[in-house]
Amino acid sequence: MSDSRTTTTKNNTTNHKTSRQGPGSACEECRRRKLRCDRQPQCQNCVDAGVYCVTNLARPARGPKKGHLKALKGRIATLERCLLEQRDGMLVDPISDDELLDKALSASSPASQSPDPSEEVSENILEDLDQVFFERVQPMVPILQRHRYFSWAREPQQSANRRGLQQAIRTLAAGVSSQLPEVRVALYRTTRHTLESLESDDTLLTAPDFEQVQAWILIAIYEFMQVSYSRGWMSAGRVFRLVQLLRLPEIDASPLSLLDLDLDPDSKWVVAEEKRRTVWMAYIMDCSLNLRHKGSLTLTEQALTRLPMPESEFQCGHPISMGFLAEALAGTDITSPLSSFAKCILLATISGRTLSHRHLSMAELLRGNPLQDVWTRHQWIDTTLTAHLQLSFSLPTAAESSDPMLLFAKMIGQAGVLSLYDILQSTPWEPETVSLLPDYEACALQAARETVVLARNLRHFSCFK
């Protein structure tokens, strides 16, 4: 009787104990920082840190993926059968153990299925790579909204385009991290296989998706950093052609162009903004590469695409209507301040004009035309570039040093100054014009020194460590 009362008392005590965790799921920021989350719509930890609170309610189930154990059993059965046949002398051609193993594994695995590194990498590492991307890569490649990505990244069923984008995000995140060299190569190979398989699908022409362009942008950057310049150049060319194929620069051609987005109003503007940012990131990549290569641009500045809004409003979900590039260049858009991304676009545009100036000058020299038009165009580009460099960076030095996009924008502007001087050196000028060349040479030397300083400062950012 006494034992019964004791048991009852223990059960009552257990029932009255409160759980250490409140109802609901912890937000992504608290999971990353390993803090106890109060599980409110905007938790106190995120409020104190000044970040947007994101809670992922669709976490994948633990354990092996569906069909994984069945595939392993099939491989084991194939190996056992091959070993029995070899023992009984049924194999006509003698083969080595390695060849036997390769044959058995290839027989049990479908050739069309790409290797998935997530089967070998733990879920915690993959989630860490997502966090690394938004902390170290997103400031330099601001094409994704964090909340929208995490809302679909953990869905059990994803489209092929989104799967390729997620793999590209994790590949580039591993590329900027020095702690996962063994994961980096496997992720890269799998991502390229996924993206190349998308291009072999005829549905690309009828069901285009800009997320495939985003994935190729990230892979091109990874290849410039980790593989080779030529491989990155080829992938960048894919980006430019896909942008043209999907007609992304016409996203703001008319108000009706946004009505084809079959989304709720809260998500529609985010998708439209991501498309704009995808177009402009491809445009900056085009200008930057050709400034080095002295080639011709694939994408033009006449894009019917609004400039990207400031990063803080984009990430926090506060839409702002921005103007067009032509208005910003003319100085007529005073409705909203330009973001560092938009300033980078402006300087890339003016510096990109030196490329067409170079080709026009060469053509006029070959035709024997007078150089007055060349000199007038040269002075106009130089004046415009100098004015925008001074206007875009009338900021405290601390503001520049904390924003990698601003530093990169200034580097593109200095590259335009060097490109102008390179054109001067290859052009036979009239005697009255030669007297101005020392001034341009001094500006070019100053631009070269400034570029070296900017490159050193850029190395201190986490994405380049």
Curated annotation (Swiss-Prot):
State the Pfam families in the record: Fungal_trans (PF04082), Zn_clus (PF00172)
The question of whether Transmembrane is a record keyword is answered with: no
Q: Which residues bind DNA?
A: 27-53
Annotated region (Disordered), positions in chain: 1-25
- Please give the PROSITE patterns that the UniProt record associates with this protein: ZN2_CY6_FUNGAL_1 (PS00463), ZN2_CY6_FUNGAL_2 (PS50048)
Q: What is its main location?
A: nucleus
Q: Does the keyword Oxidoreductase apply?
A: no
Instruction: Please give the GO cellular component terms listed in this UniProt entry.
Output: nucleus
* Keyword tags: DNA-binding, Metal-binding, Nucleus, Transcription, Transcription regulation, Zinc
Task: Output the GO biological process annotations, alphabetical, semicolon-separated.
Answer: DNA-templated transcription; positive regulation of metabolic process
SMART domains, per this entry?
GAL4 (SM00066)
Record's compositionally biased regions (Low complexity)? 1-16
The GO terms describing molecular function are:
DNA binding; DNA-binding transcription factor activity, RNA polymerase II-specific; zinc ion binding
Q: Where does it live in the cell?
A: Nucleus
Q: What task does this protein carry out?
A: Transcription factor that regulates the expression of the gene cluster that mediates the biosynthesis of azaphilones, a class of fungal metabolites characterized by a highly oxygenated pyrano-quinone bicyclic core and exhibiting a broad range of bioactivities.
Protein name per Swiss-Prot or TrEMBL: Azaphilone cluster-specific transcription factor azaR
**Native species:** Aspergillus niger (strain ATCC 1015 / CBS 113.46 / FGSC A1144 / LSHB Ac4 / NCTC 3858a / NRRL 328 / USDA 3528.7)
Q: Lineage in the entry?
A: Eukaryota, Fungi, Dikarya, Ascomycota, Pezizomycotina
